[in-house]
Amino acid sequence: MDEIDETELIGVLRAGGVVQGAAGGGLRSVPAELLRRCCHQLRDQVDPRGLRLSQVAVTGGLDLAGLTVPFPLRFDECEFDTAPVVDGAQLDELSLTGCPRLPGLLGNGLRVRRDLDLSRSQVAGALWTSASTSRTAAI
């Protein structure tokens, strides 16, 4: 699996483009830690149109807990190794659309200024959360 590196990712995000991950019948990958860096340390380099990924495999755990992200986060037809964590985050927008294997979403205390969109995504996961002490939840 071909990996999207920081130089390529930042170049597309500065230009306000969409990171395309489809390659030769498979998906290119991006490390979750790099996406966190873009939302935290490198956020001043991201165009106001936001972080937009299409058909990308996000590898590792995407942990945006407690972050304030002033631009939209849009994942279209992306795959995730683990459930994204957005506990206590303040996001402008979060869109996880058409994701074929979304292992859940941990978002206790999440604040979204605009839209939270999970259209066409298949959520398959049971997660323990502090908000539900007697059951598991997918979201």
Predicted regions located by residue number:
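N-terminal leader/targeting and pre-domain segments
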Residues: M1-I139
